[in-house]
Amino acid sequence: IILCLFIFGSQEINKNKKRLNKVNEKIFVKVISPNFDLQYGLNKKKIEERFNKLIRYSNPDKDKKTLFIWPEGVFSGYSYKEILIFKKLIKRNFSKKHLIIFGANRLNIESGNFYNSMLVVDNNLEIIKKYDKRKLVPFGEFLPFENILKVFGLKKITEGHGSFIKGNKNNNIIIDNLNILPLICYEVIFTDLIQKSDLNTNLIVNISEDGWFGKTIGPDQHFVKSIFRSIENDTFFLRSTNKGVSAIIDNKGNIAKRLNRNEAGNIEF
């Protein structure tokens, strides 16, 4: 029995390694954890400082095809349109072989609605792919019964625009051979989002601002949910957070690489 378990275990490990190689054989991936303080009212200079730190942690090789994953909330209060003033900074440091995933507030010009979005941009900061968060945090990202409560001066607690509108599409992000299921922040706790996703999903990417939790166990709980989702769906999981645990988790729930809470740097996939 012990011999059978050993043989089966060895086969599973080898199978995982082959699957890992197949998932990322065409594009190199870097997961970034910047460890920014949670701050409101950031000015242009502070946002530029954040960009420069993200670039330093990304350490881009202009000749290497790479997907960089930055967390949610790194441009606190700034919308996608407002950070376009840093286009030259991105173009100077990244090449046409690079794509960047990050979280930002996005305005739909036609409807006037704001979304909490995961964006995939090129080295011109042009949006290549996007995903709008579907599970919004009550009072944090939208105000329930807003038309009634705003009469009493109530508003959502997060900085920036009025209530976000939830996304209505279960859209995967396709990049080369990566079929990515995008999850923003606490969407990782909702199993139904993953169960209803594209059957060809071969990678789950979760970006999160975990600074909201402070010194509580919140970031650790978020991280544990990521492990559960990878096992339940037999899928590799990449997690990029600010102030939380960033990690690469294989399809069996094993932690291949990680950056701990309040640790800055990058991990490679």
Regions found by a protein language model. Give the residues of each.
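Enzyme catalytic cores with a strong preference for nitrogen-chemistry domains
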Residues: 1-269
